[in-house]
């Protein structure tokens, strides 16, 4: 009997040791994965659209881009990363602050930030992987605006502080809404875009509660029609059922919660799952920012009027807008 118990003990010990080893290996793998870039430099070349304008704005702009990084005293932020047009010309560029999705850092998506900067933006991100509260986005904006005033900074005088956009995905969508509504510097933002922002109850339960009624700047909200974004039950006010990350019902509710004097637009990418939203919204997200931050009239034609490009694009559905 003692021998049997000894064998059982050894087996259990081996199982525990194996579990520990697997946990360590998985932790190491995660750490390594978190420090690498997840998408190829030319990821945007795979994008297809029936809309010539969407295809155009999903690609590269005309500017060569330079990248900078700065250490942050905030451990959640870790590093602040900036991409901007590398030109000798003495001019200013609008800013776009990007708010990360869950467990994602700017480090992981460098090519996406660089592509956006090639359209004439100073694109700013950080390596915070839990961004829903919006606080680190707010802090990151303050940091880069201080660089604009620092004569020793490469960004000195390069930032147009009158035109600042905010872009957020998933948890970062909630974070973007909070960034433009909750903080002392929230009034500096002048345009907002979200890709599959987590619905209000989900955000509240996770500690990222937001209030869309406080949004006072042009807002383009998007989501996918796939089951990861919309589980098909519309139960956005129940804790008993998961409705998906960003179901249509939540877009409708958020859209209706914003006052009519604010330019607002909601739309869904046909067939898109939650994880597809960054690259499948690139074109129209870029155009939205070009329109509102640079006054680009061609980009505006995608969104404004009865003949707006988004209304006839088969890749988009459930479009509602008030301009």
Language model feature labels by segment:
Residues 2, 29, 33, 270-323:
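Alpha/beta-hydrolase-fold serine-hydrolase catalytic core, especially in secreted/extracellular enzymes
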Residues 175-179, 203:
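Hydrolases whose catalytic domains are alpha/beta-hydrolase-1, hotdog thioesterase
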Residues 90-101:
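Short beta-strand element of the alpha/beta-hydrolase
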Residues 35-91:
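N-terminal cap/lid segment of alpha/beta-hydrolase-fold proteins
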Residues 190-277:
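The feature captures the conserved acid-bearing segment of alpha/beta-hydrolase catalytic domains
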Residues 87-92, 135-174, 182-183:
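Gly/Ser-rich "nucleophile elbow"/oxyanion-hole loop immediately N-terminal to the catalytic nucleophile
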Residues 107-126:
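Short amphipathic alpha-helix adjacent to the substrate-entry channel of hydrolases
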Residues 1-20:
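N-terminal Sec-pathway targeting helices
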């Amino acid at each position: 009997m003692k021998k049997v118990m000894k064998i059982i003990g050894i087996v259990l010990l081996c199982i525990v040791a194996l579990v520990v080893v697997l946990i360590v290996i998985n932790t190491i793998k995660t750490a390594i994965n978190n420090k690498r870039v997840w998408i190829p430099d030319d990821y945007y070349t795979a994008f297809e659209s029936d809309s010539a304008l969407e295809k155009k704005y999903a690609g590269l702009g005309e500017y060569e881009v330079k990248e900078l990084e700065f250490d942050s005293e905030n451990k959640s932020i870790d590093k602040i990363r900036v991409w901007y047009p590398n030109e000798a010309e003495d001019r200013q560029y609008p800013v776009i602050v990007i708010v990360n999705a869950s467990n994602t850092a700017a480090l992981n998506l460098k090519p996406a930030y660089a592509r956006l900067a090639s359209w004439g933006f100073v694109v700013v991100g950080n390596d915070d992987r839990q961004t829903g509260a919006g606080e680190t986005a707010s802090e990151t904006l303050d940091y880069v605006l201080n660089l604009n005033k620092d004569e020793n900074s490469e960004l000195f005088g390069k930032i147009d502080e009158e035109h600042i956009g905010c872009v957020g995905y998933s948890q970062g969508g909630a974070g973007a809404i909070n960034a433009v509504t909750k903080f002392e510097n929230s009034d500096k933002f002048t345009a907002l875009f979200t890709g599959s922002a987590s619905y209000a109850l989900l955000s509240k339960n996770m500690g990222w509660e937001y209030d869309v009624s406080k949004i006072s700047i042009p807002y383009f909200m998007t989501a996918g029609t796939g089951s990861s974004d919309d589980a098909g039950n519309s139960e956005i006010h129940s804790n008993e059922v998961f409705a998906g990350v960003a179901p249509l019902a939540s877009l409708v509710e958020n859209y209706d919660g914003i006052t009519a004097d604010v330019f607002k637009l909601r739309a869904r990418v046909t067939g898109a799952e939650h994880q597809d939203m960054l690259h499948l919204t690139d074109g129209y997200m870029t155009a939205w920012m070009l329109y509102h931050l640079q006054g680009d009239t061609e980009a505006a034609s995608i969104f404004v009027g009865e003949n707006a490009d988004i209304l006839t694009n088969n890749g988009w559905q459930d479009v509602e807008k008030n301009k």
